[in-house]
UniProtKB/Swiss-Prot annotation:
Known catalytic reactions: 1-(5-phospho-beta-D-ribosyl)-5-[(5-phospho-beta-D-ribosylamino)methylideneamino]imidazole-4-carboxamide = 5-[(5-phospho-1-deoxy-D-ribulos-1-ylimino)methylamino]-1-(5-phospho-beta-D-ribosyl)imidazole-4-carboxamide
Source superkingdom: Bacteria
Keyword Transferase: no
The name this protein goes by in its record: 1-(5-phosphoribosyl)-5-[(5-phosphoribosylamino)methylideneamino] imidazole-4-carboxamide isomerase
Gene Ontology CC terms, in alphabetical order: cytoplasm
Compartments (UniProt record): Cytoplasm
Cytoplasm as UniProt keyword: yes
Family, similarity comment: Belongs to the HisA/HisF family.
This protein's pathway: Amino-acid biosynthesis; L-histidine biosynthesis; L-histidine from 5-phospho-alpha-D-ribose 1-diphosphate: step 4/9
InterPro entries: Aldolase_TIM (IPR013785), His_biosynth (IPR006062), HisA_bact_arch (IPR006063), Isoase_HisA-like (IPR044524), Isoase_HisA-like_bact (IPR023016), RibuloseP-bd_barrel (IPR011060)
GO biological process: L-histidine biosynthetic process; L-tryptophan biosynthetic process
EC number: 5.3.1.16
Length: 246
């Protein structure tokens, strides 16, 4: 399992939200490119970028910043979500050097879009399953659909999706621990690799996920590495050690 640091972008800054609320933010740094460099230096194998403003608007708001990070660290794959609701946006990101695009809102409203995108750019499309009470949220988490996260995941079983990024919104940014059981339940339901997100805040969370018999593919860490409660290099090393022992 790989540990993936998150960089959330809002108004040009690197921020963290609590439970996805746009009015409850903490600004951690005004230079997202420098933040990316810090995590790469700590050993990150991949970076998770979220365009928060883009997620709400439905179109990219931090495209140039993301392109700059891709140029600065070409050997570190980026996965980017937030506002990717068209083929053109996805292709622009890939052409700029982004490794993976994450489709969330449109995956809920139009699953066929994901299937078509997977055919055009196989192995480069992830689906963001941002769940509130088990149901997928959309539009920057401002709306909650009637689609169960597990049901949507099963829909993409044969589509060629690179990974499912599962976030328990209730845990996100709250430092209360990851919902390991819900993540494992999703991983049991499908053969698509599952990446955990939301609430990963301690080495115990990392150990629980990395040691899951279902084989969780990754864990995204956010607020804990910014607050100093979790050292990224130690988390990466711990995940590797647990994986070696499995």
């Amino acid at each position: 399992m790989i540990v993936i640091p998150a960089i959330d972008l809002k108004n040009g800054h690197c921020v963290r939200l609590r439970q996805g609320r746009m009015d409850d933010e903490t600004i951690f740094d005004a230079d997202p490119v420098a933040v990316a460099g810090r995590w790469v230096e700590a050993g990150a194998e991949r970076l998770h970028l979220v365009d928060l403003d883009g997620a709400v608007r439905g179109e990219p708001a931090h495209e140039q910043t993301i392109h700059a990070i891709a140029r600065a660290y070409p050997d570190t794959p980026l996965q980017i979500g937030g506002g990717i609701r068209s083929r053109e946006t996805a292709l622009r990101y890939l052409e700029a050097g982004v490794g993976y695009v994450i489709v969330g809102t449109r995956a809920v409203r139009e699953p066929a879009f994901v299937e078509e995108l997977c055919r055009e750019i196989p192995g480069r499309v992830c689906v963001g399953l941002d769940a509130r009470g088990g149901y997928v949220a959309t539009d920057g988490w401002e709306q909650t659909s009637e689609v169960a996260a597990v049901d949507l995941a099963r829909r993409f079983e044969d589509a060629g999706v690179a990974a499912l990024i599962f976030t328990d919104i209730g845990r996100d940014g709250m430092m209360q621990g990851c919902n390991v059981e819900a993540t494992r339940e999703l991983a049991r339901a499908v053969s698509i690799p599952v990446i955990a997100s939301g609430g990963v805040s301690s080495l115990e969370d990392v150990r629980s996920l990395a040691g899951s018999p279902e084989g969780i593919a990754g864990a995204i860490v956010g607020r804990a590495i910014y607050d100093g409660g979790l050292d990224l290099a130690t988390a990466i090393r711990t995940a590797q050690e647990v994986g070696d022992d499995r």
